[in-house]
Amino acid sequence: MYIFAKKILMKVPFAYGRIVGADDFTDRKNETAKLLANIASLTNTAIISPRRWGKSSLVSKAVETASKESNNYLFVRMNVFKCEDEQEFYAMFAKSIMSQISSSVENLMSNAREFISSLLPKISVSDPAGHYEISFGVDVRTSPIDESILDLPQTIASKKKMKVVVCIDEFQQIGEFRNALRFQKILRNHWQEQRDVAYILYGSKKHMMLSIFGDYNRPFYRFGDIMFLPKISTEDWCDYIVGRFSATGKSISRDVAAYLAESVDNHSYYVQQLAQASWLRTSDTCTKDVVNSSLESILDYLNLQFINTMDTLTDKQRNYLCAIADGAEQFTSMETLAKYNLGSAGNIRILKAALRKKDLIDIEGKRVFIQDPVFCLWLKTQFRKI
């Protein structure tokens, strides 16, 4: 996004809703160092956090840094969100690996013939710019891809005498497959034997990722290191926000920068969004009033989205969210049950499970909270006005 400021086309210094580059990457020094160490030692890593906390940007930063430091790594990145079963996963797995280890159409054709000839690979150039994609001549429905395709990273690592790091986003999707547990066993059995390969697995649904990697009855239990991303601290946000304002000839005090970050509970996505909105409304110096008006505009913008979310819930689920937003803690007390019309005390467990499955709430010990801080604020300030 760009604005005209003093007749100069100026780039907005805050980014959200996409994987950010080096200039927009905020702190995460410890997490980046840890992930780089895991890459160097080929330690499998699962990254777990709520949605929009910067997992993809962290992986991108680590991959970029490692690639600059050494040319002995092949990085493969894939997103399996659209995969509905194991066959689609296998196809995506093979396509992603072939595409990302090949620098040209000729190179891709050569690699495909060498490594996946049984799938009858076809290469097509999709536009005048020379972008190309790979497809398979076999019909995976009538001629299923064999699970041995999972050994492809190690095969390539051995042939090319390099280390391979496979980064899989939205990994929790495999938990939705039919016979999900059986498929997870297949993945674990193949991947744990690969000595020159590491896997970085991350996803946007925290509770599902926890069930895959944190349950000792599941195949991926102790598959590798588990990284829980913490929130970026207010102090680090202040450094970033003040610096970005200053770099574009505007100013914001540390107090106001802290107020901005804490207004959205230091949530990475929303801090960037609120900082951008505040920057756009600032001529010279950003104030708390500017931050407040910017936050109001974000609430207005998201109003319909939040209404649609509430429309998918039962009355008691909506009531329970309102109770959480109001700061209630003793959910099974007669007073709270009556005030919010939550039904019986036994119903609270059912409500928690349902809303957690929808990724609307999170639970830490005895604390129950709404994952999305702006949604929580909307519930407190606007929902009851509808």
Model-predicted regions and their roles:
Residues M1-P50, K68:
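A short, basic N-terminal segment
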Residues Y2-F14, D300, L304-I386:
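C-terminal leucine-rich, beta-strand-based interaction scaffolds used for sensing/assembly
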Residues S49-W53, S57-V165, G346:
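P-loop NTPase nucleotide-binding core
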Residues T65, A277, A354:
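Alpha-helical DNA-recognition elements
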Residues S135-K205, G214:
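Conserved Walker B catalytic segment
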Residues K206-G224:
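Short regulatory helix/loop adjacent to the ATP-binding pocket of P-loop NTPases
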Residues D225-E235:
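Conserved AAA+ ATPase "SRH/arginine-finger" region at the nucleotide-binding site
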Residues C238, V242-L304, G365:
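Amphipathic alpha-helical "lid/sensor" segments that cap RecA-like P-loop NTPase cores
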